[in-house]
Amino acid sequence: ECVALLCDNDGIPDSVERRMKIFFGIMEKAKQYGIAPSRLHIDPLVVTLGTDQTALTVFADCCRRIKYEYPEIHITSGLSNISFGLPVRKNINQAFMVLAMNAGMDSAIVDPTNKNMIGMIYATNALLERDEYCLEYIGKFGNKAAEEAAQPAPASPLDEKMQKVFKLTQDGKNKEIGQAVQEALDNSF
């Protein structure tokens, strides 16, 4: 197996065209060394969205072009690079994962203990027809449905805030209700 990055001595190219030029150079070297395309893991290199609004589109376009030229090549990425410097990074990371997988990415550097991200990967594979009859998804989560049905849903922070509003209303503490409602609204997203 071989991992190759689409960068050169000048750094990470801004354009898809320059990255693809590097990609074709990598393919020439792989051919010289007898490395089959199926053993290559190409990282098109995603940059942070906070400094480059085209971060996803350049990455996704590279993925699509690579998969068009060599469907058997694997595409990987350091997932959290896209969200560097942004607040609530997990939101950006999860959205990026889905969009990148749709463009052809089939592996990524992720936190294996992040259950939401792992669930997103299984669900996305099922939706993209990469999981025949959802067998992998069912195998991973089939028993979870029964377990979750038996467990009461945990209270969300919003539920707790609204309980406070309800209690203040019951107790007739009108002066405090406005602030409690505002706190609930501020923390609802």
Q: What do these predicted regions represent?
A:
Residues E1-S38, T48-E69, I73, S80-F189:
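ATP-dependent carboxylate/acyl-activation modules
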Residues D43-V47:
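Active-site pocket-lining segment
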